[in-house]
Amino acid sequence: MVTVFTVGHSTRSEEEFVKILKAHGVEVLVDVRSFPGSRRYPQFNRAALSESLAEAGIEYRHEPRLGGRRAPRADSHNTAWRNPQFRGYADHMETEVFRKGVEDLLEVAREARVTVMCAEAVWWRCHRSLIADYLKANGHTVLHILDEKKIEEHPFTPAARIVDGQLSYRGLL
């Protein structure tokens, strides 16, 4: 079993963001944004971020198979999620594409200290929370980086249930 970190870039400066990653010993950053760019914060565009991380000795990888912004299926049974984007992501988590993305993430995490990154500052407002549920349900440790000195171990999201040893977001609807 491995430990995986998560972080949101938020509105931080490039320097502050790199300092936070270095403080937590991050060696590889896995970008799970579906669209790895930012008009407001160009330091987090894929090319700029990759360059600044390389200068700091941190490897950058984009992992679109774990990207967010997924629409729910019409027949979605993940009704514990009221938010349609989270329900859509829960549907995506049931695909081979998602599972292969997680397998590759874990392969990297077995060899290096990895953080999964998206834009949202707090993990509970981001699809990182669902990735974290999946990892935790499969016996891995997930730590959310909040700032340079603060991390939080992932608690399951309120929508998550473990049923017969499997993560489920089935609701009462």
Residue ranges and their predicted role:
Residues 1-173:
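Residues lining hydrophobic/aromatic ligand-binding pockets adjacent to catalytic sites
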